[in-house]
């Protein structure tokens, strides 16, 4: 395709060249301009080809393969899935047999992962939200449940059937009835329970909560100090709106958001009336301290982690080691084959183990909140020549995060990241994957780099053409 377009382009350039060469004046400058145009056309063609290849990289494997190869792939994946879930499907008291994920479901999950990675916040919200409430005035508003919110930021979590982009469960507004259903959406001690009378998440809430989850604690501390003009450690509502507006503009979600008046997903204010009441009281004249806000961030992280834990259907308060491993690797970006292999090895090693409690899981994720300090501490150990074994990890957790990691949690982590089986941690890979897990993938740019590439190409073409036309003396 690019060759066919290239031939007439060259012919046109040749004709223009002959025309320019017929004129004696400024021949050298014109030749430079022609060379610049030729280089620019070549660069655009090559870059377009690379972008086309990148955009269709995932689709090529399914398009170009023959039906026979596709069928064999399906059979192989189904067989692998059956092997992986064989132990989980053993009859147990009070546990429902889990349905096996099929070939079609995997393709749907791949599509939904691309929505999470590259779509605008507006589209992500409209795809994963499941409720549409019609008010007495006839106006409607779309809401997420807490489970929808967790699903929207967790890879490989499939949206329920018949619910997708602009497909919702319709509810007529009845304040008393909906408020009575609040317990279905969140526990009374949950942050989500405080989101309005319904305990549901609006679009403004969604943007605010993703901002809180994707921003390190240190960034909020600095922003609060910048707007705390009198130094008393408190900010009012207007100052806090400025703080969170600046923080939001630095996140990938905030940079990608554009108000959509047609869908109603606009940010008229920084956050909803329910959250303003939560932070500043009913009269909105209260003050918010950095301590109280960081406590809100901690509780939000706790509630989201609890929902993730419960999605694995714990038995007697325990999830399997393989399920814990999948939580750790959910945002790793590891290739599917390698990921499947790592989880299989984990399952074989802990086939008859007792599993992990939520307290053990939460302690490890508290350890991850200090991952930058952990990275520094492990680097000191490495430079000192000490091995990064389980005892070292437990010591770092006690020193840096003030938590106690159980021996069993350390065994599972080392089973995942001890690549050569010598009982020592692969520090570089562990830290890189855990940083991605901590931010839940929300810090990644929500685009494929096309706009940035085109801007760089345009700037390069301008500078190149100028250098050819006006060479330095």
Swiss-Prot record:
Lineage of source species: Eukaryota, Metazoa, Chordata, Craniata, Vertebrata
Chain positions recorded as Ca(2+) 2 binding sites: 418, 420, 422, 424, 429
Region of interest (Polybasic region), ranges: 96-107
Protein name: Calcium uptake protein 1, mitochondrial
Any one GO biological process: positive regulation of mitochondrial calcium ion concentration
InterPro entries: EF-hand-dom_pair, EF_Hand_1_Ca_BS, EF_hand_dom, MICU1/2/3
Gene3D superfamilies, alphabetized: EF-hand
Transit peptide location: 1-33
Domain notes: The EF-hand domains have high affinity for calcium and act as sensors of calcium levels.
Keywords, comma-separated and alphabetical: Calcium, Calcium transport, Disulfide bond, Ion transport, Membrane, Metal-binding, Mitochondrion, Mitochondrion inner membrane, Repeat, Transit peptide, Transport
Region (Disordered): 61-101
Comp. bias (Acidic residues): 80-91
Family, per entry: Belongs to the MICU1 family. MICU1 subfamily.
Chain spans, region C-helix region: 452-462
Signal peptide (residue range): none
Biased composition (Basic and acidic residues): 66-79
Compartments where located: Mitochondrion intermembrane space; Mitochondrion inner membrane
Oligomer and partners: Heterodimer; disulfide-linked; heterodimerizes with micu2. Component of the uniplex complex.
Pfam families from the UniProt entry: EF-hand_5, EF-hand_8
Domain of life according to the entry: Eukaryota
Function: Calcium sensor of the mitochondrial calcium uniporter (mcu) channel, which senses calcium level via its EF-hand domains. micu1 and micu2 form a disulfide-linked heterodimer that stimulates and inhibits MCU activity, depending on the concentration of calcium. At low calcium levels, micu1 occludes the pore of the MCU channel, preventing mitochondrial calcium uptake.
Domain annotation EF-hand: ranges: 215-250, 405-440
Ion transport recorded as keyword: yes
This protein's GO CC annotations: mitochondrial inner membrane; mitochondrial intermembrane space; mitochondrial membrane; uniplex complex
Residues reported to bind Ca(2+) 1: 228, 230, 232, 234, 239
């Amino acid at each position: 395709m690019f060759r066919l377009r290239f031939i007439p382009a060259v012919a046109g350039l040749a004709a223009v060249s002959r025309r320019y060469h017929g004129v004696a004046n400024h021949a050298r400058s014109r030749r430079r301009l022609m060379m610049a145009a030729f280089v620019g056309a070549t660069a655009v063609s090559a870059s377009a080809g690379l972008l086309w290849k990148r955009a269709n990289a995932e689709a090529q494997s399914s398009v170009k393969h023959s039906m026979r190869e596709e069928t064999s792939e399906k059979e192989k994946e189904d067989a692998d899935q059956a092997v992986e879930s064989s132990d989980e499907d053993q009859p147990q008291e009070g546990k429902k047999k889990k349905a096996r994920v099929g070939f079609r479901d995997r393709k749907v999950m791949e599509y939904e992962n691309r929505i999470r990675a590259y779509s605008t916040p507006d589209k992500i919200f409209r795809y994963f939200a499941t409720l549409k409430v019609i008010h007495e005035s006839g106006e409607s508003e779309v809401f997420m449940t807490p489970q929808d919110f967790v699903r929207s930021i967790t890879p490989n979590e499939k949206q329920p059937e018949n619910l997708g982009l602009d497909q919702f469960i319709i509810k007529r507004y009845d304040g008393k009835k909906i408020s009575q259903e609040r317990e279905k959406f969140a526990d009374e001690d949950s942050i989500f329970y405080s989101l309005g009378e319904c305990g549901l998440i609006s679009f403004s809430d969604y943007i605010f909560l993703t901002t809180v989850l994707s921003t390190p604690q240190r960034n909020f501390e600095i922003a609060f100090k910048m707007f705390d003009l009198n130094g008393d450690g408190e900010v009012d509502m207007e100052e806090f709106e400025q703080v969170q507006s600046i923080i939001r503009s630095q996140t990938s979600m905030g940079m990608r958001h554009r108000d959509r008046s047609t869908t109603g997903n606009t940010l008229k204010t920084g956050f909803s009336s329910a959250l303003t009441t939560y932070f500043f009281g009913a009269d909105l004249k209260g003050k918010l301290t950095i301590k109280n806000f960081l406590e809100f961030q901690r509780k939000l992280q706790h509630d989201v982690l609890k929902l993730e834990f419960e999605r694995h259907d714990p038995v007697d308060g325990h999830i399997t080691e393989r399920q814990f491993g999948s939580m750790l690797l959910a945002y790793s970006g590891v290739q599917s084959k390698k990921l499947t292999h790592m989880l299989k090895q984990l399952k074989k090693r802990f086939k008859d183990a007792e599993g992990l409690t939520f307290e053990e899981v939460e302690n490890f994720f508290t350890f991850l909140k200090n991952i930058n300090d952990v990275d520094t501490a492990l680097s000191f150990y490495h430079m000192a020549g000490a091995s990064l074994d389980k005892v070292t990890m437990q010591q770092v957790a006690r020193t840096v995060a003030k938590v106690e990691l159980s021996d069993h949690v350390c065994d599972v982590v080392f089973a995942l990241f001890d690549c050569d089986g010598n009982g020592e941690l692969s520090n570089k890979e562990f830290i890189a994957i855990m940083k991605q897990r901590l931010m839940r993938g929300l810090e990644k740019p929500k685009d494929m780099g096309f706009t940035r590439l085109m801007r760089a190409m345009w700037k390069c073409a301008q500078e190149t053409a100028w250098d050819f036309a006006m060479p330095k003396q």
